[in-house]
Amino acid sequence: MSTASVFMDRVRLEDGYHEDDLPFIQHSLTQLFTQLERFDPSMVHIGLRVKDRGRPGMHTSVEVCVSGLPTVIGVSHLADTRAALEDAEAKVVSQLREAADRHHDRHHDRRPRQPRH
């Protein structure tokens, strides 16, 4: 099973998205899926929302929850549905990298304590 299909199973289509959107969603979220490869898929939840789809003021969001990390949300106000999803995805990927790096630094770069004499 490909990385994309594993993580597509973790996607919740919320307000404004439909099953018909799945092919373009899978293609649009490839950077996110690549970034998520370091995590167990069962620890990942992805929510997609679009408000006022196809109208001025459209609001697209991608929300990613990875167990043990803070929830990250990317938002776009671009008018094109595909471009907005990719814009929101790029924002989430950037935040996810930062959160994962901070988490890694906190848990793996601790200096051993010096014994007391």
Predicted regions and their residues:
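N-terminal, polar/charged subdomain of small-to-medium soluble alpha/beta proteins
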Residues: M1-H117
